[in-house]
Amino acid sequence: MMELMVVHPHIFWLSLGGLLLAAEMLGGNGYLLWSGVAAVITGLVVWLVPLGWEWQGVMFAILTLLAAWLWWKWLSRRVREQKHSDSHLNQRGQQLIGRRFVLESPLVNGRGHMRVGDSSWPVSASEDLGAGTHVEVIAIEGITLHIRAVSS
């Protein structure tokens, strides 16, 4: 086996790359992906240009770091370009700020509930508001929406 790796080192690198990529598909957290890609590229280069084992190891290490760095740069650019509303993906209340609704039930002492889609949200206002009042969500505190009356 060792003789085969010495005579045909590209087979070792291509096999290692395939194993790392297969393990990445099983695990799926990204740690082995770039090492697998670097091993495949190293195998292809060694197949075309015979290199000593020292240079093969250096090339593998550099390609792994380069691939991971390029992925990090691409991913950080994508995160920066993400729409602002996506940053509140798990904060539904934040998405409601600025939206307008009609109260179905009156607010007593400035407190009550308002239907938003298929859910009911606790609301508070600076004044009592009657049913049928057009309101706008101006802020959220915890799960309570702060609203104000607006003209329709």
Curated annotation (Swiss-Prot):
The keyword Transmembrane helix applies. Residues 22-31, 76-152 are cytoplasmic. GO terms for cellular component: plasma membrane. InterPro entries: Membrane_assoc_protease, NA-bd_OB-fold, NfeD-like_C. Keywords: Cell inner membrane, Cell membrane, Membrane, Transmembrane, Transmembrane helix. Residues 53-54 are periplasmic. It holds the Pfam family NfeD. Its main location: membrane. It is found in: Cell inner membrane. It is a multi-pass membrane protein. The chain crosses the membrane at residues 1-21, 32-52, 55-75. To M.jannaschii MJ0826. This is Inner membrane protein YbbJ. It comes from Escherichia coli (strain K12). The gene is ybbJ.
